[in-house]
């Protein structure tokens, strides 16, 4: 009887597990819905249909705007969608939620203007990107202004051409295994004459290569071009060169994307250390730096809060007045941030100013109402602790 009950329990658990897996599978399949966007243009002889892969929050966070990633290869869609979902689902860290656009399939009319550009016969491809493709995506979807171009082999080489010939199209380029040797665009010559003259604005260019049999014929040209780009890069242009030697050829775009995404959004996620050149200049310099990142590099707000908190923490013991002033500036800059008020409350508490600690922590609790339950619970517990300490202190 005991054995039967055990078997029955195992069977029930198994059924529940299968049901759970089924529900999870259904949820997962709906996380990144794909829509179609048809774009007609006088520059292309037939309409081009694109797959638009939307991030998980797109339909629910209707006031949110998103990064754009474009890749010319239709089969890159599952790769980008899967990597993006995995790398963004844990708090958009390291990959900020992104709209991914790829052609639905091969299109002869688009291929024609692509070939004309590669062969140096016309600039229709540049005009198509500037006049039709990117404006239509922006018209139909909520973009925040930051645009990434991704390409592999020939498409990577074309991406370098786009950067040099029309640098305002994209903010970042992920160029994996670019076919640079004897390329009709003569990219090494373009780099030598055009790269240093690009407009002085922030941009990111990742170029990667391997020693695979498919890449070997392009290694010498790759080394030449990347050396030129590293030397000639305009101010605020970050050139990132990677060699993924020993890895398979078809793994290159996966590796390139992983590395590049971390670098592209590093300034969003990583706070300035207190001993950095900018932080040493103080809170105002930190705020100015993040204003530059927001307005010039990304086109959306990048918070300075964690950098301000780090600087204040480093000064709290030996320069408490300076530390509190920094944290007060943080709450002035981010008055709706529970994290800003919590940091100031913690500073007051450490300095045994319990009354002010309670007042600030109450604001932290108030502004935490829209945060996940963990933060609501944690901040309420801190408020109780601060209040109890204040009461005990008053009773002494």
Where are these regions (language model features)?
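Active-site machinery of serine-nucleophile hydrolases
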Residues: 75-126
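A domain-start/cap signature at the N-terminus of enzymes
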Residues: 25-66, 330
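C-terminal catalytic histidine-bearing segment of alpha/beta-hydrolase fold enzymes
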Residues: 213, 223-226, 233-301, 378, ...
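Short beta-strand element of the alpha/beta-hydrolase
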Residues: 63-75
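The feature captures the conserved acid-bearing segment of alpha/beta-hydrolase catalytic domains
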Residues: 183-238, 242-245
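Gly/Ser-rich "nucleophile elbow"/oxyanion-hole loop immediately N-terminal to the catalytic nucleophile
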Residues: 59, 114-153
């Amino acid at each position: 009887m005991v054995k039967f009950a055990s078997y029955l329990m195992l069977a029930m658990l198994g059924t529940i597990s299968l049901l759970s897996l089924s529900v999870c599978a259904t949820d997962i399949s709906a996380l990144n819905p794909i829509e179609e966007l048809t774009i007609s243009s006088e520059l292309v002889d037939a309409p081009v249909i694109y797959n638009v892969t939307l991030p998980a929050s797109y339909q629910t966070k209707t006031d949110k705007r998103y990064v754009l990633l474009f890749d010319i290869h239709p089969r890159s869609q599952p790769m980008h969608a899967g990597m993006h979902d995995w790398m963004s689902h844990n708090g958009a860290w390291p990959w900020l939620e992104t709209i991914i656009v790829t052609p639905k399939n091969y299109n002869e009319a688009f291929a024609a203007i692509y070939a004309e550009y590669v062969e140096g016969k016309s600039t229709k491809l540049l005009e198509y990107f500037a006049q039709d493709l990117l404006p239509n995506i922006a018209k139909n979807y909520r973009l925040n202004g930051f645009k990434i171009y991704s390409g592999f082999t020939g498409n990577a080489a074309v991406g370098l051409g786009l950067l040099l010939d029309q640098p305002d199209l994209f903010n970042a380029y992920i160029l994996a295994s670019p076919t640079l040797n004897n390329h009709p665009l003569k990219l090494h010559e373009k780099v030598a004459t055009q790269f240093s003259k690009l407009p002085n604005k922030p941009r990111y260019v990742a170029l990667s290569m391997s020693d695979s049999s498919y890449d070997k014929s392009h290694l010498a040209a790759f080394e030449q071009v990347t050396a030129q780009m590293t030397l000639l890069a305009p101010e605020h242009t970050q050139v990132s060169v990677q060699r993924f030697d020993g890895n398979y050829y078809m793994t290159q775009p996966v590796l390139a994307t992983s590395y590049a995404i971390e670098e592209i959004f590093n300034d969003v996620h990583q706070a300035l250390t207190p001993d950095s050149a900018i932080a040493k200049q103080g809170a105002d310099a930190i705020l100015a730096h993040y204003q530059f990142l927001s307005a010039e590099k990304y086109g959306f707000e990048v918070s300075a809060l964690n950098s301000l908190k780090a600087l204040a923490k480093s000064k709290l013991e030996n320069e408490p007045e300076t530390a509190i002033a920094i944290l007060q500036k943080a709450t002035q800059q981010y008055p709706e941030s529970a994290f800003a008020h919590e940091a100031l409350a913690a500073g007051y508490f450490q300095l045994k100013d319990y009354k002010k600690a309670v007042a600030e922590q109450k604001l932290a609790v108030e502004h935490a109402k829209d945060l996940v339950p963990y933060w609501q619970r944690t901040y309420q517990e801190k408020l109780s602790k601060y209040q109890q300490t204040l009461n005990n202190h008053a009773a002494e």
